From Swiss-Prot:
Keywords: Cell membrane, Membrane, Transmembrane, Transmembrane helix, Transport. Signal peptide: none annotated. CDD domains: MFS_MdtG_MDR_like. The chain crosses the membrane at residues 13-33, 50-70, 88-108, 111-131, 147-167, 170-190, 216-236, 254-274, 286-306, 308-328, 350-370, 374-394. GO terms for molecular function: transmembrane transporter activity. This is Multi-drug resistance efflux pump PmrA homolog. It holds the Pfam family MFS_1. It is found in: Cell membrane. InterPro entries: MFS, MFS_dom, MFS_MdtG_subfamily, MFS_trans_sf, Tet-R_TetA/multi-R_MdtG-like.
């Protein structure tokens, strides 16, 4: 079979954008009513919060733990195969939750979904390997908007669908969306993957040894981890924090939802444009600017006096995320040997997922022991460390447009 035919990376970007949008929305669609659904399975009292927390965190934790394994298999068998595998399992598990007889089945299916996930990191690895190097920031920035858009639209749409069709049927609807993503991927995504001969497959250690700059690789993985910590740490207590900023409790949940989603909205609006800027002026420069901007915006959140001020700062914070995510992915694609792209992006996904789990834990722990404002200050310290580390990594490249020059 001829595997050297040039692929249309723009068409692949379009189709994978749709797939990533469906995957992103599938996770967030069920967020508004999942605790109520768990309650309907016979769980009562304080156990509802416990099992809800497990239902939310288990997929991210499981996905992070097995990401390197799926990354290796993607390097062996191709990214498209892994995307189809992930979307099929997500279709079955999300749809299957509609028939869960008790909370243990629900948790088991959520855990299984996490173990077999990987659609988004494999889409990212595929586009990173196919897009021209001078377009990688734009391509990866555009792809990043898919997950963010789905995550933004999901909660509000999920609440409406639950009221119209019932909570169980929403899981069937999500399963149908994921099935559509599977079919689109099978028939319209093309990859000229050349299998590596048996015995020539490089180990993860050998892949890392072939990375052109291991110090920068480690720094990019740390940045990926901290991006999620800064965006997620406030979520466990944001409603309670807002409550301390106002004497009115009218529409408190609605206001909290707007403030939480503000980061995603601005990131969605800016990622593609900022990705182009990274291609033009240097992704490493944009990472430093994004980190400094993130710190300048994040720290004042600890000193706001009204929900409006917090909302504005959260919205501005998204522009930092919009700069960082595509820039990190673009640099990863440039410093990674092509035979190890999937594994390196799998490690990035692992760091992202661990940040999603660590952020709420760190934020809620500091908020519980000290205060909400202290939690925000504490989280901002992670950003300072990242700024210093990134400056050390990039200092000799600041006068260059690319770290590969």
């Amino acid at each position: 079979m001829n595997r050297t035919k040039t692929v249309n990376w723009k068409r692949n970007l379009f189709i994978t954008w749709i797939g990533c949008f469906f995957v992103g929305s599938s996770f967030s669609l069920v967020m508004p009513f999942l605790p109520l659904y768990i309650q309907g399975l016979g769980v009562s009292g304080g156990n509802v919060e416990l099992y809800s927390g497990l239902a939310f965190s288990l997929p991210a934790l499981a996905s992070g733990l097995v990401a390197p394994i799926w990354g290796r298999l993607a390097d062996e068998h191709g990214r498209k195969v892994m995307m189809v595998r992930a979307s099929i399992v997500m279709t079955l598990t999300m749809g299957g939750i509609a028939f869960a007889p008790n909370v243990w089945w629900l948790l088991g299916l959520r855990l299984l979904m996490g173990f077999f996930s990987g659609y988004i990191p494999n889409s990212t690895a595929m586009i990173a390997s196919q897009a021209p190097k001078d377009k990688s920031g734009y391509a990866l920035g555009t792809l990043a908007t898919a997950m963010v858009s789905g995550t933004l639209i999901g909660p509000s749409l999920g609440g409406l669908l639950a009221e119209w069709f019932g909570m169980a049927n929403v899981f069937l609807i999500v399963g149908a969306l994921l099935a559509l993503a599977t079919l689109l991927t099978i028939f319209f995504v093309h990859e000229n993957f050349e299998p590596i001969a048996k015995g020539e497959m490089l180990s993860s250690k050998e892949i890392i040894n072939k990375v052109s700059n291991k110090q920068i690789l480690f720094g990019l993985l740390v940045t990926t981890f901290i991006i999620q910590i800064t965006s997620q740490s406030i979520e466990p207590f944001v409603t309670l924090y807002i409550k301390t900023l106002t004497t009115s409790t009218n529409n408190l949940m609605f206001i909290s939802g707007l403030i939480v989603s503000a980061v995603g909205l601005s990131a969605m609006l800016s990622s593609s444009f900022l990705g182009r800027l990274g291609d033009k002026y240097g992704s490493h420069r944009l990472i430093l600017i994004g980190l400094v901007f993130t710190f300048i915006i994040y720290l004042p959140m600890a000193f706001v006096q009204s929900p409006l001020q917090l909302g504005i700062l959260r919205f501005l914070l998204g522009f930092g995320t919009g700069a960082l995510t595509p820039s990190v992915n673009s640099l990863l694609s440039k410093i990674t040997p092509k035979e190890g792209v999937s594994r390196i992006f799998a490690y990035a996904q692992m760091c992202s997922n661990l940040g999603m789990v660590t952020g709420p834990l760190v934020g809620s722990a500091i908020a519980g022991y000290i205060s909400y404002r202290a939690a925000i200050v504490g989280t901002s310290l992670f950003v300072i460390v990242n700024i210093i580390w990134s400056f050390i990594n990039f200092r000799k490249y600041l006068r260059k447009r690319s770290i590969m020059e």
